[in-house]
């Protein structure tokens, strides 16, 4: 059993004022594997005060001093790779291929921030003026459970690169990852108060951070509903806000697509992170003339996807992170059937060979129209919908007929045509005949998928304001 009973404030591990204990589960077994003591409002206040006190000195550090600090962070986090790998499997249930990436990503994203900082121009000319990019102040960083260690390191690295100090509220469901990352960051020997990590509930710690007048910036990744609440809270003191929220991403198969080449990309995009990904391509838009062919190929591919023990090398989809999430996904599968969608693969219940744990059968629906609940709501599980279209104009209309706009993918034989379609999709990122990631490019969403951008120089700039100096 793991017991985590301290938070990190002003350069040291301290016992929280909060007294609530939160059970940690292994989602592959549904058994309790530990407990974490949660911080409360008083702890959040102490962390904010520490970050505020550290800001004047940190904001005056040079670029080279910040690069040196980030390099120490990178070395310290990279050294804990194996510990992170075990934690990701144990408390999150990520299968082997995904957990390996999740354990490497925290160090990788710090390295990416170092590269962005090295190229970042803090002072630029603008006619007769000089524009100075200045750090905002204390940044509140609120991270989700589906890749918590990576989000902690990515947001913190960008904030520190900009000259901000930080208070981090990680997900209480990811306490093992958080503990490992916190220990690593402590070992990087950053000045006290520059970063503070307080694990607690959103309605206490998160609420305090998003309302506090001494917090100048909020960076949040999570659900759209929580993002709306944070935006309302932040408006009281005109905080700058970056929100990376939900998605219902379309994967468009054009009528000239090579189906054999496309299907593996469709499956990877739809089932990434066991379907628990904001960018997952869960609406599969297919040409009516090739609907039967594509449905058959997809049904075979989905039926072949292995869901089960994350420690088994053949497993491609692990469990949902919690019983609550499992019940949510089961409810959406049931809703799809009730609304008239046709099951091509999967369905309610657990996959064959699994008894315990929060496993979901990889599920594929056909005969879906874009007004159905399963085509509108972000399910956050391994559930895909096939939606037919008549022509190019209709597929663009269907793709954009959503409150979200985070990611999309276009697959087609004519690359120029595919890019032309991509340019008409209302989305922060559109992939054309690839499933790739570019850390130098801005990442974020349109519409209800968020506000602002992260990654690369965009991520650093999000923690700063321009000051114009003349004369």
Annotate each PLM feature:
Residues 30, 66, 88, 163, ...:
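Residue-level signal for inorganic ion chemistry
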Residues 33-39, 54-60, 140-141, 251-254, ...:
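Short, well-ordered beta-strand elements within core beta-sheets of diverse protein domains
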Residues 1-127, 321:
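N-terminal Rossmann-like NAD(P)+-binding subdomain of aldehyde/semialdehyde dehydrogenases
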Residues 55, 59, 74-81, 85-88, ...:
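Structural signal for hydrophobic packing residues in well-ordered secondary-structure cores
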Residues 27, 41-44, 63, 259, ...:
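Residues at or immediately preceding the N-termini of alpha-helices
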Residues 225-368, 432:
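ALDH superfamily catalytic-core signature
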Residues 120-261, 389:
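Rossmann-like NAD(P) dinucleotide-binding subdomain of oxidoreductase/dehydrogenase enzymes
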Residues 29-35, 215, 252, 306, ...:
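Conserved C-terminal structural/oligomerization subdomain of aldehyde/semialdehyde dehydrogenase
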């Amino acid at each position: 059993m793991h017991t985590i009973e301290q938070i990190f404030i002003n350069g040291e591990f301290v016992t929280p004022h909060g007294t609530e204990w939160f059970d940690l589960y292994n989602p592959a077994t549904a058994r309790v594997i530990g407990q974490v003591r949660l911080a409360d409002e008083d702890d959040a206040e102490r962390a904010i005060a520490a970050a505020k006190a550290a800001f004047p000195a940190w904001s005056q550090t040079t670029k080279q001093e910040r690069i040196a600090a980030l390099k120490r962070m990178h070395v310290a986090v990279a050294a804990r790779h194996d510990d992170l790998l075990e934690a990701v499997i144990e408390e999150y249930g990520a299968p082997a291929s995904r957990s390996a990436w999740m354990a490497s990503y925290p160090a990788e994203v710090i390295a990416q921030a170092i590269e962005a900082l090295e190229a970042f121009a803090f002072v630029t000319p603008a006619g007769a003026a000089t524009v100075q990019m200045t750090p905002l102040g204390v940044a509140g960083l609120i991270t989700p459970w589906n890749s918590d260690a990576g989000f902690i390191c990515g947001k913190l690295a960008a904030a520190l690169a900009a000259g901000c100090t930080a208070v981090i509220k990680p997900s209480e469901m990811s306490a093992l990852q958080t503990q490992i990352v916190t220990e690593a960051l402590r070992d990087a020997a950053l000045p006290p108060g520059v970063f503070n990590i307080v694990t607690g509930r959103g309605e206490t710690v998160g609420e305090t951070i998003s309302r506090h007048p001494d917090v100048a910036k909020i960076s949040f990744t999570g659900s759209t509903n929580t993002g709306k609440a944070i935006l309302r809270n932040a408006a009281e003191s005109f905080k700058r806000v970056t929100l990376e929220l939900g998605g219902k991403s379309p994967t468009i198969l054009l009528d000239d697509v090579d189906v054999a080449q496309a299907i593996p990309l469709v499956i990877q995009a739809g089932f990434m992170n066991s379907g628990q990904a904001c960018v997952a391509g869960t609406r599969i838009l297919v040409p009516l003339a090739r609907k039967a062919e594509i449905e058959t190929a997809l049904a075979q591919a989905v039926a072949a996807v292995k869901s089960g023990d994350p420690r088994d090398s053949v497993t491609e989809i692990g469990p949902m992170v919690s019983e609550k999430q499992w019940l949510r996904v089961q409810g959406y599968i049931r809703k799809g059937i009730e609304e008239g969608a046709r099951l091509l693969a999967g369905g309610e219940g657990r996959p064959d060979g699994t008894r315990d744990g929060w496993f979901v059968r990889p599920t594929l629906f056909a005969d879906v129209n874009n007004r159905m609940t399963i085509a509108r709501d972000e399910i956050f599980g391994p559930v895909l919908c096939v939606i037919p279209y008549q022509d190019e104009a209709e597929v663009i209309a269907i793709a954009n007929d959503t409150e979200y706009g985070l990611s999309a993918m276009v697959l087609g034989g004519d690359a120029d045509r595919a890019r032309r379609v991509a340019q008409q999709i209302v989305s922060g990122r559109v992939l054309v005949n690839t499933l790739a990631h570019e850390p130098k490019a801005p990442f974020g969403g349109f519409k209800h998928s968020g506000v602002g951008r992260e990654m690369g120089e965009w991520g650093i700039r999000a923690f700063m304001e321009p000051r114009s100096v003349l004369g």
